[in-house]
Regions:
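Extracytoplasmic "Venus flytrap"
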Residues: 1, 5, 9, 14-27, ...
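Short, solvent-exposed amphipathic alpha-helices that sit
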Residues: 1-8, 92-96, 119-139, 153, ...
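Short beta-strand elements in bilobed, periplasmic/extracellular small-molecule ligand-binding domains
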Residues: 7-18, 109-114, 129-151, 196-199
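Structural motif
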Residues: 13-36, 143-165, 180-183
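Hydrophobic alpha-helical segments within soluble ligand-binding/sensing domains
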Residues: 25, 83-110, 122-123, 152-155, ...
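Hydrophobic alpha-helical
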Residues: 42-59, 128, 147-213
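Flexible loop/hinge segments that line or gate small-molecule binding clefts
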Residues: 48, 52-91, 207-216, 220
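Hinge/cleft segment of the Venus flytrap/periplasmic-binding protein
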Residues: 135, 227, 231-288
Length: 288
């Protein structure tokens, strides 16, 4: 979305990879500073974790916007961030937890997966837990495992949790779709068909892989998707506002509960992209 929008506004974009580690993210911010750009977009970096590095950006007077930098969304986010673009993360968690409750009733046994590296992930997982328990459901375990290590950890974790909880484990809720990229093989190895084992639901973000699992009846039942492409356009718009000395828009996008039935209506698309003329609207704002 950012690259598409940058093409429309006429900007050059350089992508720097944080490589899924704290050190990598710090290094990427340092590289960005060295380039002396007109603006910086922080994509999925925790502002608290990277506070020292972000202070360098602020001290250099380089405008900065972010996607999912922390729990506070919208204008004037912590860390000197002009705007933090996101859906309301608490709403996303509530929608995912309510799906599990609607699906299994108050007899559900939930395992929640999160990553304490990110404050927003902690807050989302806490809201999942609060919502399930407030309705009378049971949270069997609250699992803290790094998103960056899901490929190596989720298989053994899934096997261990199945052995520990058996049929009591009815639903798996995670703060991100990535956790379910690597859960299916362990469930299959345990002899569980997709409709038999713990039903998986994600409180964000609506990846293509998740859409494909949901569409095909794989080992994920729902996700609560964000309009990621639209948010890319909003990031460019917010950064343009910062560069021009204008006010932040304050716009907050709405999430969508994505189910197999809903995807059938979408056709072949594996992306939640709202049917609205947002590209034309932003281009008009930019005078393009």
């Amino acid at each position: 979305g950012v690259e598409e929008a940058a093409g429309a506004i006429g900007w050059e974009v350089r992508v720097l990879d944080g490589a899924g580690s704290i050190q990598g993210r710090t290094a990427a911010i340092g590289q960005a500073l060295a380039l002396q750009p007109a603006g910086i977009i922080i994509n999925g970096f925790d502002a608290v974790e990277q506070q020292a590095a972000l202070e360098g950006v602020v001290n250099s007077n380089i405008p900065m916007v972010a996607w999912h930098s922390g729990p506070k969304i919208g204008c004037d986010a912590p860390g000197g961030i002009f705007a933090n673009v996101s859906t309301d993360a608490m709403t996303v968690s509530e929608v995912a937890a309510q799906w599990a409750l609607d699906d299994g009733g108050t007899e559900i046994g939930v395992v929640i997966f999160t990553d304490s590296t990110y404050q927003i992930a902690i807050d989302k997982a806490d809201r999942l837990k609060e919502t399930v328990e407030a309705a009378g459901g049971t949270v069997l375990e609250y699992v803290d495992t790094p998103i960056a290590d899901t490929s190596s950890r989720m298989g053994p974790l899934t096997t261990s949790l199945l052995q520990k909880y058996g049929d009591s484990w009815t639903h798996a809720l995670a703060i991100n779709d990535l956790y379910f990229d690597f859960m299916g093989p362990s469930l299959a190895a345990a002899g569980l068909a997709p409709d038999q084992g713990p039903q998986a639901g994600s409180a964000g973000d609506g990846s293509e892989a998740a859409f494909q699992r949901i569409r095909s009846g794989g080992y994920q039942t729902i996700t609560v998707a964000e309009p990621l492409n639209l948010q890319g356009w909003q990031l460019v718009d917010e950064l343009n506002r910062a560069i021009q000395g204008e006010a932040c828009s304050g716009y907050i996008t709405s999430p969508a509960l994505v189910t197999q039935a809903g995807l059938e209506k979408l056709g072949d698309s594996n992306q939640f992209d709202p049917d609205s003329p947002y590209r034309d609207a932003y281009a008009k704002i930019w005078g393009k």
